[in-house]
Regions:
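HhH-family (HhH-GPD) DNA N-glycosylase catalytic core used in base-excision repair
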Residues: 1-314
Length: 314
């Protein structure tokens, strides 16, 4: 193996890999040290952040792949924040101070692995289960949809319904002849698969394409958008039925915007990065029940409806 050394600025390896589905292909060996254990170049790529440098130990001569998976291809947080103004700029700057150095780690060359990881993440603990499942799926079947679709069961890995559902979804996925380069078309094609809704399709595309404007809408994004006053409480999550029946413009004209369209409007060009920030925030501090308001940024508390209500400030 040889070593590559990158000078880094506004970058945090843990905050970049942890919220990305690319992390399902990695194992954290120690603080700020991740080793690839599944996918292309498994056991041949290792990232280690040491102060202001990212060291990459690898046999991979594809520098582009390394930049994608490390997240170093992505724009600096301050560059994105500079495009905002007013209260939104204040809030996103505060979020970025709580979770500094967040970039988007993507893997365009690992579509099958990422798609499988996203499917398995439905209503389960990602850190506890999905990581373990992905390691076993790679070791047994190299994330090959053709092999997985033919399995009668997957009990040697686990009995959770997510694993059973994976076989059904892979059967539909194999019927796809071509996945369009156009994100909206690709999204619709993926949603033709059993068990794949807007969130799964969008998350798969966000982490396999250079498209930071794609917005997977989860409960964290919805909750934080409401609490910070970005959206009205009536704004709905994207619905598979509507997403397949209508193109976005037509759906908005008939039923009004969904959360995805509102986030795209508020944060043009980088809604996926915003979703990543809110995932980190919602998973650790701004929880649905018993949020840890004392750990929150003072600026965010000023704007938060939940904090104001709990403290009789409004």
């Amino acid at each position: 193996m040889y070593t590559l050394k990158f000078k880094i600025d506004e970058y945090n390896l843990n905050f970049t890999l942890k919220p990305s589905f690319v992390s399902s292909l990695y194992e954290r060996k120690s603080p700020f040290h991740w080793i690839k254990i599944a996918g292309l170049y498994a056991k041949e790529i290792s990232f280690k952040q040491i102060n202001d440098f990212l060291e990459v130990y690898t046999n991979c001569n594809n520098k582009e792949l390394i930049l994608y998976e490390s997240g170093l291809w992505d724009e600096k947080p301050s560059s994105r924040i500079s495009k905002l103004s007013g209260s939104l700029k204040e809030q996103i700057k505060a979020l970025s101070e709580l979770f500094p150095g967040v970039r988007l780690s993507i893997a365009p060359h690992e579509f099958n692995c990422i798609f499988i990881a996203v499917i398995l993440s439905k209503r389960t603990n990602y850190e506890v289960f999905v990581r373990k499942w992905m390691k076993n799926i790679w070791n047994n079947w190299q994330c090959n949809p053709s092999i997985i679709a033919k399995l009668k069961d997957i009990k040697n890995i686990g009995t959770s319904y997510q694993l059973i559902d994976l076989i059904k979804t892979m059967n539909d996925y194999l019927k796809i002849n071509h996945l369009s380069k156009n994100e909206e078309e690709a999204r619709r094609i993926l949603m033709l698969c059993w068990g794949v809704g807007p969130k799964i399709a969008d998350a798969t595309l966000l982490f396999t394409r250079k498209a930071p404007w794609i917005v997977p809408c989860d409960v964290h994004l919805q909750r934080i958008s409401r609490r910070l006053g970005w959206i009205d409480y009536k704004i709905r999550l994207p619905l598979k039925y509507f997403c397949l029946k209508y193109y976005c413009d037509e759906c908005i004209s008939k039923y009004g915007p969904c959360l995805k369209e509102e986030i795209k409007r508020l944060f043009p060009g980088f809604g996926g990065w915003i979703q990543t920030l809110t995932y980190l925030f919602g998973n650790t501090i701004c929880k649905s029940i018993n949020p840890k308001c004392k750990l929150c940024h003072s600026i965010l508390r000023e704007y938060c409806y939940k904090f104001s209500k709990n403290n009789n400030l409004r």
